[in-house]
C-alpha cells in the first residue's frame, strides 16, 4: 500500500516509524511543516519528522501552504493509496480528501467527539478528565468531525503531564493506525455523535492566575508543562510540579517548613514542588528558597 505521510511534531514520529517498519506499506513521500528559526542563534530548524524521513531516504516536501499552485499535481504524481495525517499543522484543502484511493486517515488524541481542535490532550488534563484515548478517523471537510474507524480508552494518571500523556498516546495511536490500515477495506466507520462535541482551542495564557482555585492551577501546570509561571521580584519562575490543598488562614507567599505556600482562590493554597527561575536550572522548592535565606521573601504575583 502506497502511503503519503503528513506530520510534523514529536507526536507524529511513532506513527511514521511504524509505517516505515511495516512490510505492508511503502511511504512514498512525507509532507511536513517548513523549517523555521529556533534556538538562540535562530538557525532554521527542521521538524522531527523531516529529519527522520531524510535519514531514511524518503522524499520530503515542506510547502508553506497546500493551496499553492501545483501542489495538487505533485500529490497526484505520488499516486498514494492513502494519506495518513498526524499532527501535521497545516490546513488541508478540499482536494486532499480525494487525492488518494482511501482518502485521509487521521490519528486524533482524544475520544471524539470530545475535544475536537488543536489542544485535545491539554484540555483533557485541564478539565480533570480521568480518561482519554485515541481516535483513528477518516478526515472530512470539517474540523475533527470525520467518521470513526477505531477508538481506544486509557486512564489519565493523577500526576501525568502533557509530555507524558502525549508520549503514551502517540505510541498507542501508531499501533491503532496499523490495525486500521491492515483491514481498512472491511471496517465500517461510525459517524460521530454531534451532541457530545466539545472544542479544544489552543491554550496560550501561561502566567498563573492566583485567583483560580489551586487544584485548577495544578491541572493547568500539568496541561501546559513546562510553561506555567509566576513573577517573583521581576523574574519569571516556572512551576514544573505542584500540589494543592484547602486552608483556614494563611498569608500570600508564606514559607512553612521550607515550603512555599501560595494563597489562591476559593480558600485553597498552591505548594510548588519543582520550579525553574529564569536562566537557571530546575530545582526542588527547598533549594530555591535557600536563595532567599536571611532575606525577606519577595512578593509572588
UniProtKB/Swiss-Prot annotation:
Q: Name one GO molecular function term.
A: methionyl-tRNA formyltransferase activity
Annotated (6S)-5,6,7,8-tetrahydrofolate binding lies at: 110-113
Q: Which reaction does it catalyse?
A: L-methionyl-tRNA(fMet) + (6R)-10-formyltetrahydrofolate = N-formyl-L-methionyl-tRNA(fMet) + (6S)-5,6,7,8-tetrahydrofolate + H(+)
Q: Which domain of life is it from?
A: Bacteria
**InterPro entries given for it?**
Fmt (IPR005794), Formyl_trans_C (IPR005793), Formyl_transf_N (IPR002376), Formyl_transf_N_sf (IPR036477), Formyl_transferase-like_C_sf (IPR011034), Met-tRNA-FMT_C (IPR044135), Met-tRNA-FMT_N (IPR041711)
Tell me which SUPFAM superfamilies the record gives. Answer: FMT C-terminal domain-like, Formyltransferase
**UniProt keyword annotations, A-Z:** Protein biosynthesis, Transferase
Asked whether the UniProt record includes Transferase among its keywords, one would answer: yes
Q: What does this protein do?
A: Attaches a formyl group to the free amino group of methionyl-tRNA(fMet). The formyl group appears to play a dual role in the initiator identity of N-formylmethionyl-tRNA by promoting its recognition by IF2 and preventing the misappropriation of this tRNA by the elongation apparatus.
Q: What is this protein called?
A: Methionyl-tRNA formyltransferase
Q: Which organism is it from?
A: Anaplasma phagocytophilum (strain HZ)
Amino acid at each position: 500500500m502506497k502511503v503519503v505521510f503528513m506530520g510534523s511534531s514529536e507526536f507524529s514520529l511513532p506513527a511514521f516509524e511504524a509505517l516505515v517498519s511495516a512490510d505492508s506499506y511503502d511511504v512514498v513521500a512525507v509532507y511536513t511543516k517548513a523549517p523555521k528559526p529556533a534556538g538562540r542563534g535562530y538557525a532554521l530548524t527542521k521538524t522531527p519528522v523531516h529529519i527522520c524521513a531524510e535519514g531514511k531516504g524518503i522524499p520530503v516536501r515542506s510547502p508553506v501552504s497546500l493551496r499553492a499552485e501545483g501542489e495538487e499535481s505533485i500529490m497526484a504524481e505520488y499516486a498514494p493509496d492513502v494519506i495518513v495525517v498526524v499532527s501535521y499543522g497545516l490546513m488541508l484543502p478540499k482536494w486532499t480528501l480525494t487525492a488518494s484511493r482511501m482518502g485521509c486517515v487521521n490519528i486524533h488524541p482524544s475520544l471524539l467527539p470530545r475535544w475536537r481542535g488543536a489542544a485535545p490532550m491539554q484540555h483533557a488534563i485541564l478539565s480533570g478528565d480521568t480518561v482519554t484515548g485515541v481516535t483513528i478517523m477518516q478526515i472530512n471537510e470539517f474540523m475533527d468531525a470525520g467518521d470513526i474507524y477505531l477508538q481506544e480508552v486509557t486512564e489519565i494518571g493523577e500526576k501525568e503531564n502533557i509530555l507524558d500523556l502525549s508520549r503514551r498516546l502517540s505510541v498507542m495511536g501508531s499501533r491503532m493506525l496499523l490495525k486500521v490500515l491492515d483491514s481498512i477495506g472491511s471496517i465500517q466507520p461510525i459517524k460521530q455523535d454531534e451532541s457530545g462535541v466539545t472544542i479544544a482551542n489552543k491554550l496560550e495564557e501561561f502566567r498563573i492566575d492566583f485567583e483560580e482555585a489551586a487544584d485548577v492551577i495544578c491541572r493547568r501546570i500539568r496541561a501546559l508543562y513546562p510553561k506555567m509561571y509566576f513573577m517573583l521580584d521581576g523574574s519569571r519562575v516556572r512551576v514544573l510540579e505542584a500540589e494543592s490543598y484547602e486552608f483556614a488562614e494563611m498569608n500570600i507567599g508564606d514559607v512553612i517548613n521550607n515550603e512555599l505556600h501560595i494563597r489562591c482562590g476559593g480558600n485553597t493554597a498552591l505548594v510548588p514542588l519543582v520550579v525553574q527561575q529564569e536562566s537557571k536550572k530546575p530545582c526542588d522548592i527547598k533549594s530555591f528558597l535557600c536563595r532567599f535565606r536571611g532575606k525577606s521573601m519577595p512578593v509572588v504575583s
